[in-house]
Amino acid sequence: MKFVDEVSIRVKAGDGGNGCMSFRREKFIENGGPNGGDGGDGGSIFMMADENLNTLVDYRYTRHFDAERGSNGGSTDCTGKKGEDLILRVPVGTTVIDSATQEVIGDLTKAGQKLMVVQGGWHGLGNTRFKSSTNRAPRQTTPGKPGEQRDLKLEMKVLADVGLLGLPNAGKSTFIRSVSAAKPKVADYPFTTLVPNLGVVSVDRWKSFVIADIPGLIEGASDGAGLGIRFLKHLARTRLLLHLVDMAPLDESSAPDAAEVIVNELIKFSPSLAERDRWLVLNKCDQILEEEHEARVKEIVDRLEWTGPVYVISAIAKEGTERLTRDIMRYLEDRADRLANDPAYKEELADLDQRIEDEARAQLQALDDKRALRRSGVKSVHDIGDDDWDEEDVDDEDGPEIIYVRD
């Protein structure tokens, strides 16, 4: 199934049903009173998180959704039927954003969680509602209110405990294959991984965590190069980042330079995400002589001025992977205990999570705007020169502003 993590849709709640104007008509009752019923409320639209979904592809081709309209009221004080609510199922981890205001309407992070995105219109009133001591035969009704309408942007972020960072061919997919049952594609060319992959790592019978592998980053990714920048948002909700570095690149490039590229791109994308706990994992140690390990490790650590945990592994030979996964499990358990017992730490992490979300959304929006300008043939706003303006266009200062964009 095709992986889609961003879509734009339009949702329209049902209109409320109109009130009815009716009068009682029975044998021997010549002037019966009003008996027009109210209309039914319009149906609302909800988003529901479904743990069985892992893509938004269903909304790629069907983009307009309308809830049912409420029925009109009837005679004999019959109230119209309420419009049926519409439930749109999305993957767990989906954020719902109002496209017009960029306001985050809600975040669906738990299976079964529901979120109302547009509310159905209120019902209209029948003429029975307007009966009074001075108006015994009212001919007044009200129409139903229109339902809300919104343009929404749905963003899905995979929910994982641990995220993998690295250049293409750093061995991320091989690592996730070696520690979990996931089987992402592995090959000896860059960008083998085109979409995020998830794997469940079982440390023992009762303990496990989820690890996410995203497409590799390259230099300039924060400016739109490669594939990784749009997938970096999937690491926003991870608890720990693993920075994988190839200790023995086939092209004989510098491992310290490669490690530095990832750090720089991460900071450019989101300085707050760079503050997330991160471990350095040096992969493919089986490709170099054992006596060279210490020198290679020191070279990379010194270049990054690294002070955090460092692991030397071989994912394909499964050397050092068991120790790494057990340490990750221990870290996640300690983190959960501290969150439960330390309110200040919990508040600190919540603030960090919010900053990461805001920075990631702003970065991706800026990238989308840049791509839109490229498609229109304009590299930037500054490319529109003075010769592109016509003095006649600015005679009416109160008129609409007209901007010309080169095709």
Swiss-Prot record:
Give the protein name, as stated in the record.
GTPase Obg
Record's HAMAP family? GTPase_Obg (MF_01454)
- Read off the PANTHER family from this record: DEVELOPMENTALLY REGULATED GTP-BINDING PROTEIN-RELATED, MITOCHONDRIAL RIBOSOME-ASSOCIATED GTPASE 2
Gene3D superfamilies linked: GTP1/OBG domain, P-loop containing nucleotide triphosphate hydrolases
Q: Which cofactor does it need?
A: Mg(2+)
Q: Which residues form the OBG-type G domain?
A: 160-333
- Which InterPro entries does this entry report, sorted A to Z? G_OBG, GTP-bd, GTP-bd_Obg/CgtA, GTP1-OBG_CS, GTP1_OBG_dom, GTP1_OBG_dom_sf, OBG_GTPase, P-loop_NTPase
Enzyme Commission code: 3.6.5.-
Segments forming domain Obg: 1-159
Q: What does this protein do?
A: An essential GTPase which binds GTP, GDP and possibly (p)ppGpp with moderate affinity, with high nucleotide exchange rates and a fairly low GTP hydrolysis rate. Plays a role in control of the cell cycle, stress response, ribosome biogenesis and in those bacteria that undergo differentiation, in morphogenesis control.
